Design a protein with these regions (language model features):
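Conserved positions within compact, well-structured domain cores
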Residues: 1-191
């Protein structure tokens, strides 16, 4: 099921006391607890099947180089779909979100995920949207998979992601990367 189109009036830049503001919902979502769209890294449209064979930037045996960091470029789904200063977050910005905010696993309007609260007292909800792999969504309500705008150093086939479950947060290590063709969520940021 494809999510409903999003209206810009619903997007709120939430000040968590960090270097950037975080959007109150995922790209393609209609509410904070809505999973939103699933996107391959560097692609700006959803599809029904997420595999190496359907990835726009496949160039066997590696992927095409579209940049080491796509934040704010034509390959950034947040920037393309939302416009303005909205963009994908970087590894540095996610590290800041992880280390300078409190994280609590909750159920919000029927969706599991983390409420992330900053020093300002403001918070965002990150739904456990799962991932879109091949023709189906896997791990919804148990796992959150979110793209980071950076590729993994030394490889052009994987991009950085942050993954969470109710048992923990997994950021920034090589084991917490995904093949670029996989369909993951994107949570935008802005200055």
């Amino acid at each position: 099921k494809k999510p409903a189109a999003q209206q810009s009036a619903q997007w709120v830049a939430v000040d968590l006391g960090l270097s950037v503001k975080w959007c109150n919902m995922n790209v393609g979502a209609s509410a904070p607890e809505d999973c939103g769209g699933y996107y391959s890294w560097g692609e700006t449209k959803q599809k029904d099947y997420y595999a190496d064979s359907t990835y726009l930037y496949t160039d066997k045996p590696y992927n095409k180089n579209i940049g080491k960091n796509i934040s704010g470029t034509k390959y950034d789904v947040a920037h393309v779909k939302m416009g303005g200063d909205w963009r994908m977050p970087t590894d540095k910005e996610f590290t800041e979100l992880r280390t300078r905010c409190t994280w609590k696993w909750i159920t919000q309007n029927g969706m599991e995920g983390f409420v992330v609260t900053g020093s300002t007292g403001n918070s965002i909800f990150l739904p456990a949207a799962g991932e879109y792999f091949k023709g189906k969504v896997l791990g919804q309500r148990g796992y959150g998979y979110y793209w980071i705008a950076d590729i993994v150093d030394g490889t052009n086939t994987k991009a950085q992601s942050y993954i969470f479950t109710n048992g923990g947060l997994y950021f920034g290590s090589y084991n917490n990367t995904n093949s670029r063709f996989q369909g993951l969520s994107v949570r935008p940021v802005c200055p």
